[in-house]
């Protein structure tokens, strides 16, 4: 039987935190300060969310990604209005795939993009290659001034990227996750953040799995039970809107 706390989780907050909000979540609510929080948008690229992109070509079902894109767009708008830093990730490598690692890297053997290109050589240089359509963020989710865009060469957004140093420089402790794929890059990044003392929250309806539905369910179970918290876009937007409406 899972243990559920009745009180919200409250991190020891910095003296400069002006506003503290409480987000309904599983397994319990969690308090956060907007100025100490980042919204992480994981790999919302054509590769993962568009017909003809890498996941689609590799045989994964992406038919349900349109509502996810719409929900992420709502979450981004709410975050920007509340002063929450928005960070976009783009997964991939150079068009020669030197950064992907050769046969001495497990990435070479496990990356479905690399395996798909080995099966279909005509796709070489087109999947997850910087500068190509597949690598680009979807049209609906484009960065604005003040947002951060980070490339990442592996599943975790903390591995060989500036993420940790940027978060520390901005005094950020809470990470709200959206994006694709829940069971791969989202969960990998949240887990690594947990080990670095970041509080990770996933907005479930702003994520999508690579694989069958049970992969989504298993990832969310792991996160809420062992590594973080699970909420939804309506709760996130409503929580952020409350103090804004009071000052209007």
From Swiss-Prot:
Stored Pfam families: Isochorismatase
Keyword field: Hydrolase
GO molecular function list: hydrolase activity, acting on carbon-nitrogen (but not peptide) bonds, in linear amides
Keyword Hydrolase: yes
GO biological process, one term: uracil catabolic process
Stored SUPFAM superfamilies: Isochorismatase-like hydrolases
InterPro entries with a match to the protein in the record: Isochorismatase-like_dom, Isochorismatase-like_hydrls, Isochorismatase-like_sf, RutB
EC number per UniProt: 3.5.1.110
Residue numbers annotated as active site: 43 (proton acceptor), 152, 185 (nucleophile)
Catalytic activity line of the entry: (Z)-3-ureidoacrylate + H2O + H(+) = (Z)-3-aminoacrylate + NH4(+) + CO2; (Z)-3-ureidoacrylate + H2O = (Z)-3-aminoacrylate + carbamate + H(+); (Z)-2-methylureidoacrylate + H2O + H(+) = (Z)-2-methylaminoacrylate + NH4(+) + CO2
EC top class named in words: hydrolase
Homology family: Belongs to the isochorismatase family. RutB subfamily.
PANTHER family referenced in this protein's UniProt entry, alphabetically: ISOCHORISMATASE-LIKE DOMAIN-CONTAINING PROTEIN, PEROXYUREIDOACRYLATE/UREIDOACRYLATE AMIDOHYDROLASE-RELATED
Chain's role: Hydrolyzes ureidoacrylate to form aminoacrylate and carbamate. The carbamate hydrolyzes spontaneously, thereby releasing one of the nitrogen atoms of the pyrimidine ring as ammonia and one of its carbon atoms as CO2.
The name this protein goes by in its record: Ureidoacrylate amidohydrolase RutB
């Amino acid at each position: 039987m899972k243990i559920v706390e009745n009180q919200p989780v409250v991190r020891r907050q910095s003296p400069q935190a002006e506003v503290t909000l409480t987000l309904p979540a599983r397994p319990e609510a969690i308090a956060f300060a907007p100025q100490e929080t980042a919204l992480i948008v994981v790999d919302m690229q054509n590769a993962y969310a568009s017909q003809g992109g890498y996941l689609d070509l590799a045989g994964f079902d992406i038919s349900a990604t349109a509502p996810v894109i719409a929900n992420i767009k709502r979450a981004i708008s709410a975050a920007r209005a509340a002063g929450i830093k928005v960070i976009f990730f783009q997964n991939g490598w150079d068009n020669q795939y030197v950064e992907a690692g050769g046969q001495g890297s497990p990435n070479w053997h496990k990356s479905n993009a690399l395996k798909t290109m080995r099966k279909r050589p005509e796709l070489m240089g087109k999947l997850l290659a910087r500068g190509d359509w597949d690598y680009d963020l979807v049209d609906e989710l484009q960065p604005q001034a003040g947002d951060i865009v980070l490339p990442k060469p592996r599943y975790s957004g903390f591995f060989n990227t500036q993420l940790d140093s940027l978060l520390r420089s901005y005094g950020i402790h809470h990470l709200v996750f959206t994006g694709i794929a829940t069971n791969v890059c989202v969960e990998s990044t949240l887990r690594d953040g947990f080990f670095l003392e970041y509080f990770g929250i996933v907005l479930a309806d702003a994520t999508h799995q690579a694989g069958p539905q049970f992969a989504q369910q298993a990832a969310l179970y792991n996160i809420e039970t062992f590594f973080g918290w699970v909420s939804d876009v309506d709760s996130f937007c409503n929580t952020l809107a409350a103090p804004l409406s009071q000052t209007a």
